[in-house]
Curated annotation (Swiss-Prot):
The chain crosses the membrane at residues 6-26, 46-66, 79-99, 101-121, 147-167, 178-198, 212-232, 248-268. It is found in: Cell membrane. Belongs to the 4-toluene sulfonate uptake permease (TSUP) (TC 2.A.102) family. Disulfide bonds: none annotated. This is Probable membrane transporter protein HI_0806. The lineage of its organism: Bacteria, Pseudomonadati, Pseudomonadota, Gammaproteobacteria, Pasteurellales.
Length: 268
């Protein structure tokens, strides 16, 4: 692997950690387009598996810092929503092998564009203190996260960019809890999807070093960059204004969607 590629991947790790810690999205929205650009010879499924592994490693780093900050969540909700996400992820994973790269890229682009518009137009809601979430609200969350997992499984974006706006719409979830919920669900939901990718047979020449269903060398380099950035990201997270954070998230999602669309349908 060229030094320039390693440098780019380190920068990707830094950016991945920032968007994961500050916005609650896993970084898959960054990694999928970047990996498609750096390694165009790899199948989209291998890129998705590599992206998911990076997302899980970054989420684990963030959770260690969240634990030190003593941010509490409802673990019953987290488990129920994670199970729903896993179901959606597995369905999406199986469907991804029946879709062409163009269709997967189209789903990726449309999903991110819709989320960007919704996030940008969404007004700040009044924070309601709810200690016991109603069964209806929990069911609403489960259905939403199953759908989010479906899109994540098809596209390999990790689910955080989809889950973060959905978690924020649920009553009883505080703003500072959103990133904690999504990071937990990205790890749990990603495990099943990653297992499927690693045990699935691929018909391609794995010529890159560190390649086994996913590229472990890429994962290691990006995770290293993510770890180096983690402390600064948590400090920056505490300084960011919620309104500004939401607007920036919308802009990031839209720019990535536009880039992926141009990469696939203009230059491909």
């Amino acid at each position: 692997m060229a030094f320039s590629t390693i440098f780019i991947l380190l920068i990707c790790g830094i950016c991945t950690n920032m968007v994961s810690a500050i916005f609650g999205i896993g970084g898959g929205v960054l990694m999928v387009p970047i990996l498609r650009t750096l390694f165009p010879e790899l199948p989209i499924q291998v890129i998705s598996a590599t992206s998911l592994t990076i997302v899980m490693c970054t989420a684990l780093i963030n959770l260690l810092f969240f634990h030190k900050q003593k941010i509490k969540i409802d673990y019953i909700n987290m488990i129920l929503w994670s199970i729903a996400m896993v179901i959606g992820v597995q369905i999406g994973f199986e469907l991804s092998f029946y879709f062409s790269t163009a269709i997967i890229s189209l789903i990726f682009t449309v999903s991110l564009s819709a989320l960007a518009i919704k996030t940008f137009l969404n007004r700040s809601r009044i924070q309601i203190e709810v200690f016991n979430m109603s069964p209806i609200e929990r069911a609403k969350g489960s259905i939403s996260f199953c759908g989010g997992g479906l899109i994540a499984g098809i596209t390999g974006i990790g689910g955080g960019s989809i889950l973060a706006p959905l978690v924020g719409q649920l009553k009883g979830v505080k703003t500072q809890q959103i990133a904690v919920y999504t990071n937990y669900m990205m790890i749990i939901g990603g495990i099943g999807n990653l297992y499927g990718y690693l045990t699935r047979a691929f018909l391609y020449d794995a010529s890159l070093s560190g390649q086994l269903g996913l590229n472990f060398l890429v994962v290691g380099v990006v995770t290293l960059g993510s770890f180096e950035m983690s402390f600064f990201s948590m400090k920056l997270r505490g300084l960011m204004n919620p309104v500004l954070t939401r607007k920036l998230l919308a802009i990031i999602l839209f720019c990535i969607a536009a880039y992926m669309c141009i990469l696939e349908f203009v230059f491909h």
